[in-house]
C-alpha cells in the first residue's frame, strides 16, 4: 500500500509540475494561424485573432481571448458576424480528479453579434447550422454511454457580461432592432440557493421608432433539473420612449416575487405584484397555468388611472379625414372572435379607486371577469358615478356558431349635467337620470345585432 501511495503521489506531483511549467513553455499565440486555418476549413469564415491568447493549467485550467472576430456570411454586410473584445473562463484542475467541476467567474466583454435575414429569407447563420456533408468515420460507430456529472457537482463562480450588443436586421420585413449595452452580473451559481442577478440593456426599434431601457435585479433560485425558477425580490424598471409610447415617454417600475415552473405544462405566478407607472400604482397578483392552453387568474387593484392617456390618438391625417367624411365600419365584419373566446380560460377581478375613460370619471370601480368554455361573463360596477351609481352584467355565449349576448344595466341617480360636460364639453339639459336596461341579441355583425335585438330599457 505504501509503495502504491508513493507512485500515486509521484504521478500527482508530475502532473502538477507539468501544469505549472507548460504555460511557461507553450505560447498559445504560436498556434494562431493553425486555429484560423481550421475555422476557415470548417466554416468557410475568416477568424481574426488580433489580440493575445492566454493559457493557464494550474491551479486553474483556463483560456483567455482578446480582440477576436468572425467574418460574416457571403452576400451579407461587411461588418463581422461576431466580435469579442475579451473572454475568460477557468476550471479548477484538482477537483476534476474527483469528478467535481469548479468554474471561475465567466467573463465576456465587448461582444457584438450581427444577425441578418435577406429578402429571400436566408439568414447569415444558415451556413453555420447545416451539418457537413463530408463523410465522418465516427458517424457509423455506436455512441458509447458516458458517465455524466450531476449538476450538484458543478460550481460556477458567476457570470459577467459587459457591453454586449446584438443587432437584428430583417430585409424581408423591413425590421431593424438593436440590443445595446447589455450588462449582466450574477453571483456564484449554486443550485437551490439564491443567486444575485443584475441585468441592464437598451432596445432600439426603427419601425415603430422606439427605445426601451431595461434594468432588472433580484435573487434567483434554480432547481437541480433547471425547470423551476424562483425570482425573489425581483425589481424591473422600463424606460420607454417613441411614437408608440403614450405621451412620447413612460417609466414603469415593477416589483414582484416571480415563480416559473416549466414542468407539467408550465406555470408562472407573480405574487405579490406591484407596478408603478405615471401617477398610478397597480397591485395584486397574477398567474398563468398550462402554457399550451393557458388558464389565467388575476386579482388587481389600481389607486387612480386615466385610461384616455393610453388610448391611441388620431393623426393629423385621420383628424382631417373625420371632419370631411366619416366612413362607417363594414357591416358584415365579424365583431366577436368566436374561436378565440372558446379557447380562453380567464378568471379575475380588477378594481380602481378612481378611473377616467372618455372624459368620464368613476370612483370605486370594479370588474369581475370569467371566461370559460366559450362563455364570457363580466360583472361591472361604479359605486360613485356623478352623484349616482352604475351596475351591469354582460354575458357573451359563443358555444354555438351564432353568439348570444345578454346585457343588463342599471344607472341610479346620475346627475346628467356634469356627465355631459365631461363627455361632450357642454350640457343642453339638466336633471337626474335613472335607467334600467335588459337586452338580448344574437349574431356576430351589426345588422344581425339590430335584427335580433330584444328587451327593455326605461
List the predicted regions and their residue ranges.
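Short extracytoplasmic
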Residues: 41-67
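N-terminal type II signal-anchor transmembrane helix
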Residues: 1-44
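Intrinsically disordered, low-complexity segments enriched in small/polar residues
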Residues: 128-148, 313-339
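Phosphate/ribose-recognition catalytic cores of enzymes acting on nucleotide-derived substrates
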Residues: 84
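A glycine-/polar-enriched beta->alpha junction
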Residues: 91-97
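Small-residue helix/turn framework positions
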Residues: 17, 60-81, 103-130, 158-165, ...
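An amphipathic, basic-hydrophobic helix/alpha-beta surface used to engage anionic
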Residues: 87
